[in-house]
Amino acid sequence: MKKSYWISLYLKVENQDNLKKYAEVVTPIIKSFGGVPLVRGGKFETLEGETYPRTVIWEFPSHEQAMKCHDSKEYQDGWALAKDTTERNLQIIEGFSTE
């Protein structure tokens, strides 16, 4: 089974406190669907294209699990804490097998 990756590119964060509350609430929810955090902010360099002030990447055991997590009521309730003061692009991308 191929893993899938949840990639959030934040375009604008108007309220850091709301984003922090969102992260605190949704982290255990995402983990309950098998999500593993790979990138959460941190030092970065923009070498080409647009700069995003924050990037978050989660790894999931499958595309289906990533979608179930995103579509769950629990996650959507958590996202409601930040969505009015945050603008982001979110993609769920299936990885490839190296075997």
Short names for language-model regions:
Residues 1-54, 61-71, 94-99:
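Short S/T/G/P-rich N-terminal loop/turn motif that feeds into the first structured element of a domain
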Residues 67-69, 74-91:
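C-terminal structural segments of small proteins and small subunits
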